[in-house]
A protein has these predicted regions:
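Cysteine-based protein phosphatase catalytic domain of the PTP/DSP
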Residues: 74-178, 182, 193-239
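Glycine-rich nucleophile elbow surrounding the catalytic serine of serine-hydrolase chemistry
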Residues: 184-190
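Alpha-helix initiation/capping motif
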Residues: 3-4, 68, 109-112, 155, ...
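Non-catalytic regulatory/accessory regions that flank a structured catalytic core
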Residues: 1-103, 233-237, 241-255
C-alpha cells in the first residue's frame, strides 16, 4: 500500500519534537514552544488518520467545505502545512489540475483557484478533509463533501452517497468534478464507482484503467480497492437501479 499519512505525519511529529528539545536545550524556550505544539498536533492527526481509527471529523470541516475558526487555529500547523505542500508539489509535477475522463466527468486535484476548475460550472465532489472550499466557489457550484484523510479511502456508504448525487447532476446535464488533493487516490476511487454506475465501465477495475489512460499518475492503494470491492458487493446485493430511475429521482431532488 505504500507509506500512509499516519507514518508520514508521525515522522513529522518526531522531527518537530526533536527540534523542540534541541532549541530548549540550547536556551531558546520561546522558539521551542511552537515546535512542541506542532509536534503534538501532528501526533494527534497521525493517530486519528490510522485506518483502525479513521476519524476525519477531527479537523471539523463543515459540510459546505469550510473550516470553523477553532479548527483553523487549533490545527493550523497541519492545515496550512498541507496546503503549502500541495501547492508546491503540484507546481513541480507539471500535471494538469484536472482530467476529463468522459464527457462531463472530471477528476483532479484541489481547486485552489477558479482556473483550476473544469469548464461548465461543474458540480463539485470534495473528497478531502484537510483542504478548504475556496470562497469564490461558494454559491456558484453545487457541492458535496465526503471528508477523507489523504491516502485513505471514502467508506463504501460515502462512495454510494457521492455516486447517487453525481448521477442526479449528470441527469440534469451538469458536469461533475471529483477532487482530492492531487487527483490520484480518493477522488479516483469515487470516479471509478461513478463510471460503473453510469454504465461507462463494466466494473471498477476497468474504470481504473479508463481513468489511468486519461490521468496516468493516479495510484489507488489497497484501502481504495477494498472500499470499491465492498461497494461493488453492496451494489450487486441491492435492487438494480437503472439510468431512467436516476433521471426520475433527479426530478424530485434538485439539490
Amino acid at each position: 500500500m505504500g507509506v500512509g499519512i499516519s507514518v508520514l505525519i508521525g515522522l513529522k511529529s518526531v522531527t518537530l519534537f526533536i527540534l523542540f528539545a534541541t532549541l530548549k536545550n540550547y536556551g531558546y524556550p520561546l522558539l521551542s514552544i511552537p515546535c512542541l505544539y506542532a509536534s503534538l498536533v501532528s501526533l494527534l492527526v497521525a493517530v486519528a488518520a490510522n485506518p483502525s481509527i479513521d476519524l476525519p471529523i477531527l479537523l471539523g470541516k463543515n459540510s459546505d467545505g469550510t473550516f470553523p475558526i477553532w479548527s483553523l487555529v487549533m490545527f493550523s500547523p497541519y492545515l496550512y502545512f498541507v496546503r503549502a505542500f500541495s501547492a508546491l508539489r503540484r507546481t513541480k509535477s507539471g500535471e494538469p489540475p484536472y482530467s476529463e475522463i468522459s464527457e462531463g466527468l472530471y477528476v483532479g486535484g484541489w481547486p485552489c483557484s477558479l482556473d483550476k476548475l473544469p469548464p461548465g460550472n461543474p458540480a463539485i465532489i470534495d473528497c478531502t478533509c484537510e483542504m478548504p472550499r475556496m470562497l469564490e466557489f461558494t454559491g456558484n457550484h453545487a457541492f458535496l463533501c465526503i471528508p477523507t484523510w489523504d491516502t485513505r479511502s471514502p467508506q463504501p456508504a460515502d462512495i454510494e452517497v457521492a455516486v447517487k448525487w453525481a448521477c442526479r447532476k449528470r441527469a440534469q446535464k451538469i458536469p461533475v468534478f471529483i477532487h482530492c488533493a492531487y487527483g490520484h487516490g480518493r477522488s479516483v476511487a469515487v470516479m471509478c464507482a461513478l463510471l460503473v454506475a453510469l454504465g461507462l465501465a463494466e466494473d471498477w477495475k476497468n474504470a481504473e484503467k479508463l481513468i489511468k489512460e486519461k490521468r496516468p499518475y493516479i495510484r489507488m492503494n489497497a484501502l481504495h480497492r477494498k472500499a470499491l470491492e465492498e461497494w461493488s458487493k453492496d451494489r450487486l446485493s441491492s435492487p438494480k437501479v437503472g439510468v431512467s430511475s436516476v433521471i426520475l429521482s433527479s426530478a424530485n431532488d434538485r439539490s
